[in-house]
Structure formats: structure tokens, C-alpha cells
């Protein structure tokens, strides 16, 4: 069996060798590419004769899947799979394995970190001090007492909600279904319009798919207060980013 990792994944060659040793010891061929490419022709070349291809967030479009005649499984070291030609994979009976949930806590904590930075001007103050200035005039605010709106109350959204509550925030949420666990935590479900218009901090946590692409359109973005902190730790195309820039 031929297995190929088509892109670097942020670890050393020594780690790759250690992790791939059990594969090669069983007689399988393992190939590692330490450069990233989005060129379909190069991706197709790297995939030639492969039974299993591994990627992270590198695009693997339909035209590449089409040419991968030996491919049986596509292993994705990433949560989302919107960068893959999934329809063609289904058509060719190619199994897709992704790493759903591998970084839920990490992303939830990142959301909190971004909120703290936006409220307390951490990065800006750091830059000023490093250049001989002071943080004078950068009055900060607290999460405590703020209303936080979570759009998409899945695993990441719920984890972030719990963390915000630990800071003393009131959490409201918009989700297409309601969770008894969330209700037990005191999270209030609201309409999307109410979440956007009444929240001091809005955290977007939806997956990217055909239904959510462009979900946060210009008219919805306009519902937010000019002082609202908007955090998108989901995927960029869920938001009309041009409208976000200009509003």
C-alpha cells in the first residue's frame, strides 16, 4: 500500500519518520512532501499510485480526486472538509476521514483570548511599550457584565459559552436546535437578529457548508452595534467580509 502525506504539518522530519515507522515496518510505502502546493497538476502527480493520501488544510479539489485512480481513502488532519472535492470522492467511493473535534477546547480558549485582547488592547499596548511608550489612554473593559452572543452552539460554541460565563458574562445564543445542556447552564436562546443587535461580543462558530456560505450577510452585519466585538473563529466565507469591512 502506498501512503503519502502531501504537505508539511508543522512538525520536524524526525517526528514524521518516527510516526511513519510502524507503517513502513509493515511493508507499506510512505512518502512525505515537505513543501505545500495548490497546483492541481502537482497534487495529482504526488497522488499517483497512492492508496491513501493525507492532507491538512491543503486544497484537494475535484479535478485532483478525478485523477487519483488508486485512491481509497483521503485522511484530513483538519476539522472542516470544505477544501476537498467531496462529491467526486463519494462518486468514486473514496473514504474521507477528518479530525473532527481535535481542537475544540483550543478554539474555545482562542475565542476568549481574542475577546480579552479586544477589550484590554493587549497587542496594541505591547507594541507601544516595546517602542518606549506606555499604555496610557488605552482604557480597558471587562468581560464580566457583558452580553456575549454565540452563533452556532455546537461543541466549540458551548465550550466558549462556559468560559465566558466563568468570567461573569451573560450568554445568549442562536442555533437551529436547542440543547437541554445549554438551557441548564442558563444560556438563553434568541433569534439571530436579537443576538446580533444586543450582544457586546458576538462569536461565530458555524461550520462552512452550502447553507452557511454567506450566512452573515450585509443586512445582518448591520444589526450589530458599532462597538460590538465580532470574533470569527469559524470559516471566512460564512461572512460577507467586504460588507464587514465597510460597515
Language-model-detected regions and their locations in the chain:
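Structural motif corresponding to alpha-helix initiation and N-cap regions
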Residues: 13, 17, 37-43, 58-62, ...
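N-terminal Rossmann-fold NAD(P) dinucleotide-binding loop
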Residues: 157-158
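Glycine-rich Rossmann-fold phosphate-binding loop(s) that bind the pyrophosphate
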Residues: 153-154
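Phosphate-binding beta-alpha-beta segment of Rossmann-like dinucleotide-binding domains, i.e.
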Residues: 92-94, 99-147, 162, 166, ...
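Rossmann-like adenosine-cofactor binding region
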Residues: 62-65, 177-245
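Structural detector of well-ordered beta-strand residues that form the stable sheet scaffold
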Residues: 4, 73-75, 95-97, 172, ...
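Phosphate/diphosphate ligand-binding glycine-rich loop within oxidoreductases
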Residues: 49-126, 246
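N-terminal glycine-/charge-rich "phosphate-binding" loop or analogous flexible N-terminal tail
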Residues: 1-50, 172
Amino acid at each position: 500500500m502506498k501512503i503519502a502525506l502531501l504537505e508539511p504539518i508543522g512538525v520536524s522530519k524526525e517526528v514524521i519518520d518516527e510516526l511513519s515507522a510502524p507503517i513502513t515496518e509493515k511493508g507499506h510505502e510512505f512518502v512525505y512532501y515537505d513543501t505545500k502546493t495548490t497546483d492541481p497538476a502537482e497534487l495529482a502527480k504526488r497522488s499517483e499510485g497512492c492508496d491513501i493520501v493525507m492532507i491538512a488544510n491543503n486544497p484537494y479539489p475535484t479535478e485532483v480526486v478525478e485523477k487519483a485512480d488508486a485512491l481509497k481513502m483521503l485522511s484530513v488532519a483538519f476539522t472542516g472538509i470544505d477544501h476537498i472535492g467531496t462529491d467526486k470522492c463519494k462518486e468514486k467511493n473514496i473514504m474521507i476521514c477528518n479530525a473532527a473535534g481535535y481542537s475544540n477546547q483550543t478554539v474555545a480558549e482562542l475565542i476568549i483570548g481574542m475577546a480579552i485582547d479586544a477589550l484590554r488592547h493587549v497587542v496594541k499596548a505591547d507594541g507601544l511599550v516595546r517602542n518606549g511608550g506606555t499604555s496610557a489612554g488605552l482604557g480597558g473593559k471587562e468581560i464580566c457584565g457583558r452580553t456575549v452572543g454565540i452563533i452556532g452552539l455546537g461543541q466549540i460554541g458551548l465550550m466558549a459559552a462556559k468560559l465566558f460565563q466563568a468570567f461573569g458574562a451573560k450568554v445568549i445564543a442562536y442555533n437551529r436546535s436547542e440543547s437541554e445542556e445549554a438551557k441548564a447552564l442558563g444560556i438563553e436562546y434568541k433569534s439571530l437578529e436579537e443576538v446580533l443587535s444586543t450582544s457586546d461580543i458576538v462569536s461565530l462558530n458555524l461550520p462552512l457548508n452550502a447553507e452557511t456560505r454567506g450566512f452573515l450577510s450585509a443586512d445582518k452585519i448591520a444589526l450589530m452595534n458599532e462597538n460590538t466585538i465580532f470574533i470569527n473563529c469559524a470559516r471566512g466565507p460564512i461572512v460577507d467580509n467586504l460588507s464587514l469591512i465597510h460597515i
